[in-house]
């Protein structure tokens, strides 16, 4: 299983003082050198952490894979085509939320989604949709032309015991189904050093995206050690 590192909260820390450090690009390079196969950043409409100049700098610096998380807006579509990340991941976005709270409402926005994705796919950028682990959402993702889906693991992360086991089963079944349709499968949201291990046994999930937990750990041990510790668990 591969690891992609979300570096948004390096920018959160920097923005707390409106200064230049810590630098998200430096964090991204350290993560890459330590074994991450991709760097994830979410350019939110309110620019609360990653900002436009960060995205431009990351595009120049990242040599593995840059995954731009973004809302389905005309502004973000234009930014994606101008920036040319290897991958974009469409996520729902609410200004009042602390973090992404659920999967993209693909059925509600399907017609708009197909039109929105056309120029991005035409530019050669891969498409991922952040969705709930549900068959209907997977069917629509495939129909819309997604290359891969990121299964939302937030409910799993919030539960314990038997309830968590039920959520894990849903994720496993969704991963198997998505793979059967020819979609690549990744997972993310709320995953950490304590709850990630069971995902090693879901061979259909090729990659996990981890941000907050890893950056929090890095505050104590540094980014290289935090990345290596996570890789030791997932592999």
Swiss-Prot record:
Entry binding sites for 3-amino-2-oxopropyl phosphate: 6, 17, 190, 211-212
A Gene Ontology molecular function term of the record: pyridoxine 5'-phosphate synthase activity
Pathway(s) annotated for this protein in UniProt: Cofactor biosynthesis; pyridoxine 5'-phosphate biosynthesis; pyridoxine 5'-phosphate from D-erythrose 4-phosphate: step 5/5
Primary location recorded for the protein, binned into one broad class: cytoplasm
Residues holding 1-deoxy-D-xylulose 5-phosphate: 8-9, 44, 49, 99
Record's keyword annotation contains Membrane: no
Keyword Iron-sulfur included in the entry's annotation: no
Residue numbers marked as site, Transition state stabilizer: 150
Protein keywords: Cytoplasm, Pyridoxine biosynthesis, Transferase
SUPFAM superfamilies: Pyridoxine 5'-phosphate synthase
Catalytic residue list: 42, 69, 189
GO BP terms, alphabetized: pyridoxine biosynthetic process
Domain of life: Bacteria
Gene3D superfamilies given in the database record: Aldolase class I
Intracellular or extracellular location(s): Cytoplasm
Enzymatic reactions: 3-amino-2-oxopropyl phosphate + 1-deoxy-D-xylulose 5-phosphate = pyridoxine 5'-phosphate + phosphate + 2 H2O + H(+)
GO annotations of cellular component type: cytosol
Subunit structure: Homooctamer; tetramer of dimers.
Listed NCBIfam families: pdxJ, PRK05265.1-3, PRK05265.1-5
Family: Belongs to the PNP synthase family.
Protein name: Pyridoxine 5'-phosphate synthase
Source organism of this protein record: Chlorobium phaeovibrioides (strain DSM 265 / 1930) (Prosthecochloris vibrioformis (strain DSM 265))
Lineage: Bacteria, Pseudomonadati, Chlorobiota, Chlorobiia, Chlorobiales
């Amino acid at each position: 299983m591969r690891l992609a590192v979300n570096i948004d909260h390096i920018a959160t820390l920097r923005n707390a003082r409106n200064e230049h450090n810590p630098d998200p690009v430096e964090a991204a390079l350290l993560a890459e050198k330590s074994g991450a196969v991709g760097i994830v950043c979410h350019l939110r409409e309110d620019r609360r952490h990653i900002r436009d100049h960060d995205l431009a700098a990351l595009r120049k610096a990242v040599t593995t894979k840059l995954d731009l998380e973004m809302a389905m807006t005309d502004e973000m579509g234009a930014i994606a085509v101008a920036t040319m990340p290897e991958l974009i991941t469409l996520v729902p976005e609410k200004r009042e939320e602390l973090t992404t709270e659920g999967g993209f409402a693909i059925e509600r926005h399907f017609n708009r989604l197909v039109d929105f994705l056309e120029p991005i796919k035409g530019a050669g950028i891969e498409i991922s949709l952040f969705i709930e682990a549900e068959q209907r959402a997977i069917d629509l993702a495939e129909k819309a032309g997604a290359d891969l889906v990121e299964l939302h693991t937030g409910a799993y992360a919030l539960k314990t015991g038997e309830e968590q086991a039920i959520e894990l089963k849903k994720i496993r079944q969704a991963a198997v189904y998505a793979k059967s349709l020819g979609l690549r499968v990744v997972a993310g949201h709320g995953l950490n050093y304590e709850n990630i291990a069971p995902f090693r046994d879901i061979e259909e999930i090729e990659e996990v995206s981890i941000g907050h937990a890893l950056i929090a750990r890095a505050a104590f041990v540094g980014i290289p050690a935090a990345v290596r510790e996570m890789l030791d668990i997932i592999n």
